[in-house]
């Protein structure tokens, strides 16, 4: 009888220990899954903002511009219509204010680092808003794509944060040399970059 009690006690202890190990392994698995889910959430949590471009300077230029921030990079995509066929400049300007009929309420090019105007990434210098030129097709339509790690959406770095600025499309092309703005002509479309 004593042997049976000892064997029963041993079985209970073995079963209890086994359950404890299973529970410990289960908790480790749960922790691993939760960590993986957190990593996926961080990767997926891209910030996307979209704005409509307003015609300026008696033009018919309109469209949408989208900013997508993901993995430390901001991608801008602009879909435009109503342009004259050919080359046009697109820049980020200082103020998210498109109230003036000529778009000049948006101020000059966004230039937080006080560099001379120039082509993007030029060794002689460039404004953080100097996106560059694009080509409108024969129907006056254009798609502009631009990506950089030198911008952010709402971060604390004023040398990178484009919130509170404006996107301006110009009548002509940027020559990348004329100071302070590239002699790109009238502002034909504008939108503020606001959250």
Which role does the model predict for each range below?
Residues 1-7:
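Bacterial N-terminal signal peptides that target proteins for export
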Residues 5, 20-87, 94-195:
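N-terminal leader/targeting pre-sequences
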Residues 7-13:
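Sec-dependent N-terminal signal peptides
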Residues 15-18:
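C-terminal motif of bacterial Sec signal peptides marking the signal peptidase cleavage site
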């Amino acid at each position: 009888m004593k042997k049976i009690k000892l064997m029963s006690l041993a079985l209970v202890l073995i079963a209890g220990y086994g359950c404890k190990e299973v529970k410990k392994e289960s908790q480790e698995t749960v922790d691993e899954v939760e960590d993986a889910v957190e990593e996926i959430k961080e990767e997926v949590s891209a910030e996307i903002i979209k704005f409509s471009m307003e015609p300026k300077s008696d033009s018919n230029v309109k469209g949408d511009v989208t900013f997508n921030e993901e993995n430390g990079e901001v991608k801008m995509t602009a879909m435009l219509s109503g342009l004259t066929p050919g080359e046009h400049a697109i820049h980020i300007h200082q103020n998210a204010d498109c109230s003036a009929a000529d778009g000049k309420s948006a101020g000059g090019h966004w230039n937080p680092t006080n560099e001379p105007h120039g082509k993007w990434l030029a060794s002689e210098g460039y404004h953080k808003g100097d996106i560059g030129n694009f080509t409108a097709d024969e129907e006056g339509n254009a798609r502009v794509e631009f990506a950089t790690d030198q911008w952010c959406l709402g971060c604390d770095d004023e040398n990178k944060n484009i919130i509170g600025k404006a996107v301006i499309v110009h009548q002509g092309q940027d020559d990348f040399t004329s100071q302070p703005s590239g002699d790109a002509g009238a502002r034909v479309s504008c939108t503020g970059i606001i959250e």
